[in-house]
Amino acid sequence: MPALSTGAGSDTGLYEILATLPAQLQPHVDSQEDLTFLWDMFGEKSLHSLVKIHEKLHYYEKENPMPVIHSATALAEELAEELQSKSLNSEIRELLKLLSKPNLKALLSVHDTVAQKSYDPVLPPMPDDIDDDEDSVKIIRLVKNREPLGATIKKDEKTGAIVVARIMRGGAADRSGLIHVGDELREVNGISVEDKKPEEIIHILAQSQGAITFKIIPSIKEEPPNNDGKMFVKALFDYYPNEDKAIPCKEAGLSFRKGDILQIMSQDDATWWQAKHEGDANPRAGLIPSKQFQERRFALRKPVVSNQPQKVPNRKSSGFRRSFRLSRKDRKTNKFMYECKKSDQYDTADVPTYEEVALYQRKPNEKYRLVILVGPVGVGVNELKRKVLIGNSQHYGVTVPHTTRGKRSQENDGVEYIFISKHLFETDIHNNKFIEYGEYKNNYYGTSLDSVRSVLAKNKICLLDVQPNSLKHLRTSEFKPFVIFIKPPTIERLRETRRNAKVISGKDERGAAKPFSDEDFEEMIQSAEAMEAQYDHFFDTTIVNDDLSAAYNELRSTLERLEMEGFWVPVSWLHS
């Protein structure tokens, strides 16, 4: 690229832009061919000449010079006539020769045009026989390379015309700004689309390479200002457009998995939104079902997962486990006593489609987020929680449970339990003060919301393990919970790693802890699958407890990241 230079005192702004643009654009250019094109384009002499003209005009625009005379051409002609009548000497002959030169006449003509400001084009008069109903036609030429055009078409049921149904955000059509929803398509590359089906036109477009020429009649409907692209949602279901019979164009669909963060680019269509994956450098959006449309489809489907927990013979409290404390002396009672009142273990949650989210990172003066551990019986939730507490008891804490049973001699109120009367416990139940509660041997046991608040008030991270049906009640702006699902490995790994462990939910006839059986392993896996099927849209991360040490290290790393990094949370948590 030739060196750029300007005269002394001229504005170098545009020259600096031209000189730096190729280097600035280099990280965003995919091929060396495109980069060479940019260097050649910005090095064109004609472009530099235009820049010089622009700067000269800009200079005179600021100076605003006034013409001394508006008719220099007429003055020159009068002067020439007068000189013809004089005696001709060498100087007069030279002046007459100069005034007759075409270049000077053209210069004076341009001067008069600028002085009189008569440079605006004069349009011809409108013809008298024009049809008032005739539509204006626009010719558009787009270069789409190998990417899709980024627009869908449909046949207008009333007029039979082929119209643009949708413009995909970030696609070639959207970037051009020349094609709009509602535009009527007349020709593609000189081929009339009259009496053609949309599928035939799509085939023509697919066969076209490089530049495509459209003849369209612009839509008269004004498009509202585009404020899209600022909304982010968390997907609460898996979606594969190739399997969706309702999508208008499978190729335009965007596939995603449960838990993916999507940036919503357009909600103009009530049935099909346009979105892209958060952080994706590709500007093109894809079609996804709208929240309302997907909710209607889910509502029409029959539930495939039973709400009733698995029944296991001779297991008095199968499917439930609750350790209200980690280092209490009577753990043998609490391990198997808990049964939630009025609780199906896997209740029917709201129809999960999308949840609007925003990026959140805790500020130094804010309380810590509540950390919830969820997992099936025997998976090791309590052991992982215990190891975290042992590792840093000053930074992490657990709740103290409430009970209505009598205090034993070696117990202290507020340490092992918070001891309250049955009447007060039932009053607190009525006032929804308990996260979970149960009854064992005519005594109530429960975890209260205030016990969570008490841990957080000490500037500690509260570690809480609950049944999954309690999650939706804890997902509030007050607690901003981070939910970790502890998942069992395969049954083969369970047999290998836990065969010699002691079951925590039952005793044999002599009161000794029983080893895990295949029945326990199967129940653990089935319980985990049921939890995932119904509640995994609440889970922020999943840890497979294949090896306790590895699972603990992963848990500790997750807790450290939670304090240092931003995470996506429901937007309602930040606005309340």
Swiss-Prot record:
Main location: membrane
One cellular component (GO) term of this entry: membrane
Gene3D superfamilies: 2.30.42.10, L27 domain, P-loop containing nucleotide triphosphate hydrolases, SH3 Domains
Pfam families: Guanylate_kin, L27, PDZ, SH3_1
Ranges for domain Guanylate kinase-like: 368-560
Signal peptide from the UniProt entry: none
Keywords: Cell junction, Membrane, Repeat, SH3 domain, Tight junction
Record-annotated L27 domain positions: 10-63, 65-122
Membrane topology label: Peripheral membrane protein
Subcellular location: Membrane; Cell junction, Tight junction; Cell junction, Adherens junction
InterPro entries associated with the record: GK/Ca_channel_bsu, Guanylate_kin-like_dom, Guanylate_kinase_CS, L27_C, L27_dom, L27_dom_sf, MAGUK, MPP7_SH3
Superkingdom in the source lineage: Eukaryota
Domain PDZ: 139-220
SH3 domain ranges (all copies): 228-298
Family (UniProt): Belongs to the MAGUK family.
Annotated function: Acts as an important adapter that promotes epithelial cell polarity and tight junction formation. Involved in the assembly of protein complexes at sites of cell-cell contact.
Identification of the protein by name: MAGUK p55 subfamily member 7
Taxonomy of the source species: Eukaryota, Metazoa, Chordata, Craniata, Vertebrata
